A protein has these predicted regions:
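Solvent-exposed, flexible loop/coil segments flanking beta-strands in beta-rich domains
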Residues: 1-35
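C-terminal interaction-tip segments
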Residues: 1-15, 106-126
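Exposed aromatic-hydrophobic patches
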Residues: 29-31, 85-93
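Noncatalytic modules at the cell exterior or secretory-pathway interfaces
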Residues: 38-42, 93-113
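Extended, low-complexity, turn-rich repeat/linker tracts enriched in Gly/Pro/Ser/Thr and Asp/Glu
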Residues: 47-55, 108-112
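Beta-strand signatures of extracellular beta-sandwich domains
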Residues: 57-61
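Short loop/turn segments immediately following beta-strands, especially the blade-tip
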Residues: 62-67
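Solvent-exposed serine/threonine-rich low-complexity stretches and specific carbohydrate-binding patches
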Residues: 71-81
């Protein structure tokens, strides 16, 4: 379902990862997609990595019960290294499990990344 005037009032922001500095691998909290329909757009915004040979891999995982998560097929951003990066990817809320979360893997020597991941989705009911 696309975004148009008729459904803009149903557009909702989803926080995958709030803006913060990350120095080690981790993940966000589960996001309940039960009240959403269609595609969910996720936006990664990352400053250039710090440290020596920094790498950042960000993926979306899903879970049926919000406790055991696994990688969602095709839901990986392009690796971020020494340059700032803004990227987007979409997932279908109809084709994944009820909960999703953002997972990030950081590598390198003393790596740091300032980043955020925000989602945009349409609520089923306005």
């Amino acid at each position: 379902m696309g975004y148009n005037r008729a459904n803009l009032e149903r557009l909702d922001l989803l926080t995958g990862l709030g803006t913060s500095t990350k120095t080690a691998t981790g993940q966000g909290t589960g996001i309940d997609l039960q009240d959403y329909e269609g595609d969910i757009l996720f936006i990664l915004d990352s400053a250039a990595g710090g440290g020596s040979s920094p790498t950042l891999d960000v993926t979306i995982e899903d879970s049926a019960e919000n406790s055991t998560f696994a990688a969602l097929s095709g839901a990986a951003f392009t690796q971020v290294t020494g340059s700032a990066s803004s990227q987007k990817l979409s997932i279908s809320s109809d084709e994944c499990k009820r909960y999703v979360r953002v997972k990030f893997t950081i590598g390198g020597s003393s790596p740091t990344f300032d980043l955020s991941v925000t989602g945009l989705g349409l609520k089923k009911y306005g």
